[in-house]
Amino acid sequence: MEPPSSINSTPPTIVVIFGASGDLTARKLGPAILNLSMDSLLPFHCYLIGYGRKEISDIEFRNYIKESTEKHSRRKISEETWKSLEENVSFHAGSYDNLEDFHSLSAQIDSIEKKLDQAIQCLFYISTPPTVFKPILENLGKSGLAKRHRNKHVESKVIIEKPFGRDLASANDLNAIINRRFAETQVFRIDHYLGKETVQSLLVQRFANSIFEPVWNRNYVSSVQITVSENLGVESRGGYYDRSGALRDMIQNHVMQLLALTAMEPPSSLDPESIRNEKVKALQALKPLVVSGDNSEIVRGVYSQGLVDGEKAIGYLQEEGIPQDSITETYASLCLQMENWRWKGVPFYLRSGKRLAMKASEIVVQFKRPPEILFGKDSKYALSPNLLVIRIQPNEGITLYLNSKTPGLETRLQPIELAFGYETTFGSNTPEAYERLILDALNGDGTLFIRGDEAETSWGLLSPVLDYWQNQKSKGLESYAAGTWGPISADKLLLSRGHEWLTGTNFC
């Protein structure tokens, strides 16, 4: 799980980005590769080939990578770093469904390998709309690119961006195509949340500190809340988002991964498969959701006009590209229960949405109150539950909330914070998530990536919810004002179970 300080001793590598002229390359992938190079973490011979349908010259693509990195990188890239890579950056124009274009790409890779007289590792990064995942994967297989140096330390690898399907059936279909062309050890399904420092540290906090693991169970935990909220609307992604929605776009991947890491049992080792095995077991322990009736465990909503940060915001149906009869949810919350020894009876509350009160991603573990023998009888004590808040963004860090006596002649209680912030402790220039994930993929370490059965298990839980909502049409799609924390029914979901949402009050 821990990356080496340098991998310059590894074989030459070619990174091929499909969809290279897109926004992800400009904002994340280009800057990540150049930052890895600046830290001497790339192989000595490293090449970057952009692949796309546009006719772009090598010089134009180099300028695109350099300029976008200057704009989006977490730090200034040295001229020396750029010069060392510049001549190795090129662009290959081609179609995603034309096999001949993939043969041409293969010939380009062969020529580089012949020039170096050394076996080359290929890392194919699929950064395209999901509609072209299938032809890219099929043509990587048919052209022989997927099988290059199979079962050797330089075998080809492929990174696939989410979404990993739209439901269980499509996830199964995608995995079938992947498994037909690649071995699972070659496949890296990427969720950039897993590359964030706080998420990486979650297993360390749980299993390297004896104060947490003994109380990390149903005997001491009252509830777990996971929030991934955004204060922005759909902006220019209206067309894509309306085909997706909050459940598909955020909960099925980001939020469910956070749940798995929070709830999983200790792995037998830090080996990638040991960790991923336990994540799958945690997901498999989740009970099917109750989708209707008085005990329903799901809520959905759509934002209407409101105020966000003091400015007027339009409603979802007024956004560009959104049909007036849309039934897509921009907010979803769930109450999940686990059928296992550790978590039996502990609700896991999940929520995600757009145009909410603030941008925040965090896990809140609420512990049970102590017996109200000493401090619970008198209201002046104001006994609050202990909370462990794991902030993923913004301001990555961990805060433990405890009760303490306030100064004075009377015994009065007040919650206090024991806080740790990554930036305060380690400085602000920590690596971006994509840097860690690309480096791990180059090293063949799948710890922070999603395995095929993980994706299928998650979809197996959520597909019945999507089917129910589709059949209900607009019934139950509750409106909430932009700038609030979502539908009223989301509050009732917790209140009816003896809890309330904790995120967004005095945290973040």
Q: Which residues does each PLM region occupy?
A:
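Secretory/organelle targeting and membrane-embedding segments
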Residues: M1-I160, F164-C508
